[in-house]
Amino acid sequence: MQQQKLLSLIRQAIEDYNMIEEGDKIAVGVSGGKDSLALLHAMKILNRFYPKNFELYAITCNVGFEGMDFTGVRKFCESINVPYEQVDTEIAKIVFEDNKDERPCSLCAKLRKGAMYKRLGELGINKIAYAHNKDDFIETALMSLIYEGRFYAFPPVTYLPEAGVTVIRPMMYVPEKGVACLLYTS
């Protein structure tokens, strides 16, 4: 799949769901994986010619596992001239040592998002973009149907009033197989 087609799919999702408004400050939630880096790269390209002006940032939550190193993410952000924020936490200690929750992934995700949303508020950033792709939406809907008996997937846009942040998912039309193309054709 060509990069132009993928950028077109991202732009289409943004327009279909009014994900970007004039003057938005948008942070891409970056894990260091291909999906989030591809989204950051695509948003940087779109930022140059999109008709609505917006500021772009990248944010990572370091949950505190030993050996985690986000130097590569920081360098990538520098190379495309996107301000980068790393939120350092002790979430791993809380989840795995202090709490020993039976569902550590769920608790970790909640704490990680909470830490990022808090920092976004401090920085005056009003939106966070996650790199959930088309396959993620389909898998989530099917798992919800199988395990919960209901058909549910992530909403494309979600306002979180307690955090004052809007979550957007611009890659919702991009198939998994096309994600790497955004990085490797640049």
Language model: regions and residue ranges:
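Short, flexible loop segments at boundaries between secondary-structure elements
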Residues: 153-174
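ATP-dependent adenylation/nucleotidyltransferase module used to activate substrates
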Residues: 1-142, 147-150, 155, 177-178
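Conserved small/polar residues in nucleotide/adenosyl-binding loops
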Residues: 184-185
